[in-house]
Amino acid sequence: MQILVDADACPVVSIVERVAKEHNLPVTLLCDTNHVLSSDYSEVIVVGAGADAVDYKLISICHKGDIIVSQDYGVAAMVLGKGAYAIHQSGKWYTNENIDQMLMERHLNKKARRASGKKHLRGSRKRISEDDEHFRESFEKMIHMAMDKEK
């Protein structure tokens, strides 16, 4: 089992690394050339800046049982199909039971933005420490669940 992070502008990278280190799990951070990262713990893979390049690379190296951290519903759907686990930076788990609904909502929101001529209907609120704690707790639970299933 490894942890793969869609690390372009991901606010929970340090939390992922800290928790993964506690469990001795390898972490791979994926970013494009516009968001070059460095890490003392994680492997960093930098891909070209093409549209969705990081997403495609992440999907290609993901395996059954891996844990993926991404805010992209499309990536989540693809890795779930490969038997991996996926979690949003909010701590929400993507599952086979909720991903279809999430993709439909994304589609409807995109249609609404097009119809209104707006690029975004609303911005996300500023991240607070409670958000980080919620992510950490949810991520920890996912790791334990994945480890139990590996046994």
What are the language-model segments listed below?
Residues 2-151:
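Nuclease catalytic cores that cleave nucleic-acid phosphodiester bonds
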